[in-house]
């Protein structure tokens, strides 16, 4: 086995190269901060499962990302957050959806995994578990920010749902198929799903993903993030966290397909991740981060950009948005 490795993302989408510094830098700093937390946790020999939960909790606490405190609003002006987490060593996993009072959805997903015989709990049942387990909760109004109220207003006026990191009004019509070509505009939506994958020096793997979903989504809509095998997956070969257009990710079972290509076709992590992103999903829809048991890292995307960061035990680290080669 190689040394430890970690990767995290803050969402993929049509991120313009002209993204203003005041919108770009807070996210880069957020990624840098969370990456360092993950590095220190791995150096302290914390289990990868604990590391990915810790890092995603921190990302959920940064308002510049579409998760936790930064979660976007439904067409009714409410928040419905979702998250999932998976341990590659045991294949245990937990997922939650429809949360509007839980400060850190990823930690409730961990409680589902650790404290129940189930994998996926949603809406009031999930929040009731959170109360039983002492998960931090707040009034739902805590998540209704002026910025997201304005974003929802613009989306409703255009009768559209806005996807991760689409340009200002780069949205998709509510009734259109998600795979159709979408109109472009200028700017940046300032939203992005978050995720983290990690492996320790013994090859133990874990993955975690959290999101607020789509701006102006229908109440009750569930995306790829809490679906094991779509937005999140980990086994003994790799750990994967996906981001982008949820419906496209679900159709392609993105996260599981990376692992399946490694398992059944013998592809390397990079080959498998590139195949899924560039050959199996529509252009402009998907990005992912992945690590292998050997410590390899892959961070492909078929969108304009993806906020991402990674580090390895040998000292390599990277924080990037757009293609680097």
UniProtKB/Swiss-Prot annotation:
Originating species: Lupinus albus
Protein name as annotated: Isoaspartyl peptidase/L-asparaginase
Catalytic activity: Cleavage of a beta-linked Asp residue from the N-terminus of a polypeptide
GO biological process per UniProt: proteolysis
The organism's taxonomic lineage, starting at the top: Eukaryota, Viridiplantae, Streptophyta, Embryophyta, Tracheophyta
Keywords: Autocatalytic cleavage, Hydrolase, Protease
Record-annotated active site: 193
Protein modification: Cleaved into an alpha and beta chain by autocatalysis; this activates the enzyme. The N-terminal residue of the beta subunit is responsible for the nucleophile hydrolase activity.
Subunit structure: Heterotetramer of two alpha and two beta chains arranged as a dimer of alpha/beta heterodimers.
Record EC number: 3.4.19.5
Biological function: Acts in asparagine catabolism but also in the final steps of protein degradation via hydrolysis of a range of isoaspartyl dipeptides.
Binding site for substrate: 221-224, 243-246
SUPFAM superfamilies given in the database record: N-terminal nucleophile aminohydrolases (Ntn hydrolases) (SSF56235)
Record-stated family: Belongs to the Ntn-hydrolase family.
Catalytic EC class: hydrolase
GO molecular function: beta-aspartyl-peptidase activity; hydrolase activity, acting on carbon-nitrogen (but not peptide) bonds, in linear amides
Site (Cleavage) residue list: 192-193
């Amino acid at each position: 086995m190689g040394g430890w490795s970690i990767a995290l993302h803050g969402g993929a989408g049509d991120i313009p190269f002209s993204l203003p510094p005041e919108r770009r830098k807070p996210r880069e700093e957020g990624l840098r901060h969370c990456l360092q937390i993950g590095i220190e946790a791995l150096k302290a020999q914390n289990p990868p499962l604990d590391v990915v939960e810790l890092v995603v909790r921190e990302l959920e606490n940064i308002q510049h990302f579409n998760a936790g405190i930064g979660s976007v609003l439904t067409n009714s002006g409410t928040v419905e957050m979702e998250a999932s987490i998976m341990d590659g060593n045991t294949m245990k996993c937990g997922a939650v959806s429809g949360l509007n009072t839980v400060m850190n959805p990823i930690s409730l997903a961990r409680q589902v995994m650790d404290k129940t015989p189930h994998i996926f709990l949603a809406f009031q049942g999930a929040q009731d578990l959170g109360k039983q387990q002492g998960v931090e909760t707040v009034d739902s109004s805590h998540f209704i920010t002026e910025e997201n109220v304005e974003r929802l207003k613009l989306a409703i006026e255009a009768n559209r749902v806005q996807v991760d990191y689409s340009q200002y009004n780069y949205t998709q019509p509510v009734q259109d198929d998600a795979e159709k070509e979408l109109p472009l505009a200028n700017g940046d939506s300032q939203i992005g799903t978050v995720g983290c994958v990690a492996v320790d020096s013994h090859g133990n793997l874990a993955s975690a993903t959290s999101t607020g979903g789509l701006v102006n989504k229908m109440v009750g809509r569930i995306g790829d993030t809490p679906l094991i095998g779509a937005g999140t997956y980990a086994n003994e070969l790799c750990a994967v966290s996906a981001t982008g257009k949820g419906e496209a990710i679900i159709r392609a079972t993105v996260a599981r397909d990376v692992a399946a290509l490694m398992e059944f076709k013998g592809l390397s992590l990079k080959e498998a991740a590139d195949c899924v992103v560039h050959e199996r999903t529509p252009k402009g829809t998907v990005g992912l981060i992945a690590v292998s048991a050997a410590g390899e890292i892959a961070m492909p995307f078929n969108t304009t950009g993806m906020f991402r960061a990674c580090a390895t035990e040998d000292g390599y680290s990277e924080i990037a948005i757009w293609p680097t080669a």
